[in-house]
């Protein structure tokens, strides 16, 4: 189940929870974030590489490239046994911005995006089939949990792909992790 919690950036212990897809979409649209549910029903093998994932979802990728002019696409696929899961998690947990507009399409698993917009933090739990955009220069971070299990197609408007400018803020450490967030929803 996708979910959104909107917090004041100085009150990570209190937030307004939305679990209805239309409500999530409407709240995110207010800050210029696109949130959609796409079909993610291609069967991927456990060892599917980037080329296999991109081939399986080529129609969706082509549609997005045509619509937004994306110049680069990659796949991030992590599982609990990934040897660099801790390194990746720490990198993505640091608040950062990108100069370009980016889109994430979750084709397996889930992850938690935090969008820091003005005085609010929007925690968006993305699940299989969710597509989320992050507007250029939006401060954000991402948590995949201690034992990640997700496959996500990432699309960028620049040929360089994922290039982050880290803010140096420690705000991410004050908000619930993916594991804490999901436990609270249960």
Question: How should each PLM-predicted stretch be described?
Answer:
Residues 143-186:
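Double-stranded beta-helix
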Residues 37, 74-77, 154:
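Structural signal for conserved beta-strand scaffold positions within catalytic alpha/beta enzyme cores
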Residues 1-70:
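N-terminal leader/capping segments at the start of a protein or of a new domain
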Residues 97-117:
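Short, conserved beta-strand element in jelly-roll/cupin
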Residues 75-99:
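Conserved short histidine dyad/triad with adjacent acidic residue
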Residues 85, 113-115, 122:
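Short, solvent-exposed loop/turn segments at secondary-structure junctions
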Residues 126-146:
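Conserved metal-binding segment of the jelly-roll/cupin
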């Amino acid at each position: 189940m996708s979910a959104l919690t909107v917090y004041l950036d100085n009150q990570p212990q209190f937030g307004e929870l939305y679990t209805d897809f239309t409500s999530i979409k409407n709240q995110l649209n207010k800050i210029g974030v696109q949130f959609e549910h796409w079909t993610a029903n291609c069967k991927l093998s456990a060892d599917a590489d980037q080329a296999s994932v991109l081939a399986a979802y080529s129609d969706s990728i082509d549609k997005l490239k045509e619509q937004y002019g994306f110049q680069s696409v990659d796949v991030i696929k992590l599982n609990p046994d990934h040897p660099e899961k801790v390194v990746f998690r720490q990198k993505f947990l640091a608040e950062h911005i990108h100069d370009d507009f980016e889109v994430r399409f979750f084709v397996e698993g889930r992850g938690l995006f935090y969008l820091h917009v003005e005085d609010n933090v929007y925690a968006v739990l993305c699940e299989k089939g969710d597509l989320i955009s992050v507007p250029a220069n939006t401060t954000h971070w991402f948590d995949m949990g201690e034992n990640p299990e997700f496959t996500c197609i990432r699309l960028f408007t620049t040929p360089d792909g994922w290039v982050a400018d880290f803010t140096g803020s420690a705000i991410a450490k004050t908000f619930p992790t993916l594991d804490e967030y999901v436990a609270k929803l249960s």
